[in-house]
Amino acid sequence: MKSIELKTKEVAEAYSIISAAKYQKLSDDDKVKVWKISRKLSPIAEQYSKDVEDAKQRLLPSEDFPQKLQMALKYQSLRDSGEKDLPMTEEEFSKIAAEWNNYNAILDKALKDRAEEKISIEIEPITEEAFGKLMASNDWSFEQVNKLEFILE
């Protein structure tokens, strides 16, 4: 077993990659190891995802903000295509854009501590050879591979 320490956000990112992984080229033992790693990450990643969704809902500037945002996106699309009959003024659009920026800043502030929280996990790591086979079974970017390096022996 290997004890690792990751930030909550790193666990969530790794889980999103490993939970969708294909295992075809792995030995049976390595398939089980990767599956067990996924199960260790799952509850942490799922709770973090719930926390993010909860914050997104509870920290909305107003109940009608999602509708305002849709209207602003429609305005922007129509304006960019040269349409003359627009659903709002530039001033109204700017006000919604400012609300959006403020909302995102509040979300970032609210979730920063949660995302950076350190989590200790015990896993049974896989060999470099097995990791190579796992990569060969999946079409991962370099960034995705880096997020999974912790599963190596």
Q: What is each residue range found by the language model?
A:
Residues 1-153:
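A composition-driven surface/loop motif
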